[in-house]
């Protein structure tokens, strides 16, 4: 009887552990990718690995470091990794650099009405993507229930993180740092019908022209869901630090944003931008944004205007409340020119 139980235990253990593999080097990785099954965990040993890997339709895949203190480093390729329709994907403790396209590309395989869910990205280091052009650190299209946590993205050509038609997502505790020589249009961009996204506790340092591009401009064929009438809606941006760049945040074709509790330090041309870049029939004007309880430090000498307000927008629907505004070089000129009257604003007192 004891022998029977022992055999049953060994059989059960072998089933559980069969999908957990240790990988050493690019060739072992390529071989493992050819044999992938749902539920596989790949633990990658330290060292350099080639980029250029593509995985499609494998559910509950985990790719992580064998030693989180010495993560594997994926160098080069158009993309380090491209995952299409990989439900339940987890990537953690990986380094990625030197790609000519995107660092990571995750998508729905072009099935615009069928979102891919349950993806987690954490403790990733992504750098030197591009350097010039629409080359993203992390590109996400048609995903839902997505978490990006504790990632560091440095030097990219397009967006640090780019969401096109993604829903119910959290970006938390990440750092975005631009670098001279990389074109970097945005730190985070949320567009193409994206909704219900929270960005919190992130740090943006010279993170592109628009560290937070909430909304944007998307070709009609790429909206998820098809027929959406906004670039982004139901977005929460809270408790972030935003340093430098031409502006702190741009609201572009959005319908509902809460921007609160953030610290803004020394934007170079405007504090905020209110824009409408998608003007096709049926699209709502940029509207319904609440800017509250932020700490905003700037220099009058640097700013062209406090806000850049473009055409086809609805700035009268914005709410400003309880923000602390401080012009470091001219404290007496700290009160900004806003499109609506602010409630309980604080002006001329250094909030740092």
Predicted regions: what they are:
Residues 28-32:
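Short acidic active-site motifs
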Residues 20-27, 43-46, 50-52, 56-104, ...:
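Right-handed parallel beta-helix/beta-spiral solenoid domain characteristic of secreted/periplasmic
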């Amino acid at each position: 009887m004891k022998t029977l139980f022992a055999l049953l235990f060994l059989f059960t253990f072998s089933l559980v552990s069969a999908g957990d593999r240790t990988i050493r080097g690019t060739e072992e990785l390529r071989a493992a990718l050819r044999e992938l099954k749902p539920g596989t965990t790949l633990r990658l040993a330290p060292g350099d690995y080639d980029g250029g890997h593509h995985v499609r339709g494998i559910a509950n895949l985990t790719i992580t470091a064998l030693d989180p203190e010495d993560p594997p480093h994926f160098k080069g390729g158009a993309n380090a990794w491209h995952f299409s329709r990989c439900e339940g994907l987890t990537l953690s403790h990986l380094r990625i650099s030197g790609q000519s396209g995107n660092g990571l590309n995750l998508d729905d395989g072009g099935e615009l009405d069928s979102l891919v869910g349950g993806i987690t990205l954490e403790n990733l280091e992504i750098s030197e993507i591009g350097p010039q052009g629409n080359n993203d650190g992390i590109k996400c299209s048609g995903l839902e229930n997505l978490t990006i946590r504790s990632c560091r993205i440095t030097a990219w050509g397009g967006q640090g993180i780019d969401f096109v038609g993604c829903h119910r997502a959290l970006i938390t505790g990440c750092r975005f740092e631009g670098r001279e020589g990389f074109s970097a249009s945005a730190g985070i961009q949320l567009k193409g019908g994206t909704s219900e996204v929270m960005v919190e506790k992130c740090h943006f340092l010279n993170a592109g022209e628009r560290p937070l591009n909430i909304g944007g401009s998307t070709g009609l064929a790429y909206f998820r869901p098809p027929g959406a009438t906004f670039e982004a809606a139901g977005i929460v941006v809270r408790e972030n630090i935003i340093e430098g760049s031409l502006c702190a945040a741009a609201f572009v074709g959005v319908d509902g944003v809460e921007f609160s509790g953030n610290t803004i330090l020394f934007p170079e041309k405007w504090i905020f931008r209110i824009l409408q870049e998608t003007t096709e029939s049926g699209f709502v004007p940029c509207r319904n944004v609440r800017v509250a309880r932020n700490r905003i430090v700037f220099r009058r000498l640097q700013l062209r205007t406090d806000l850049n307000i473009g055409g086809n927008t609805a700035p009268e629907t914005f709410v400003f409340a309880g923000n602390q505004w401080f012009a470091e070089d001219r404290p007496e000129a700290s009160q900004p020119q806003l499109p609506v009257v602010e409630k309980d604003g604080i002006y001329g007192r250094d909030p740092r």
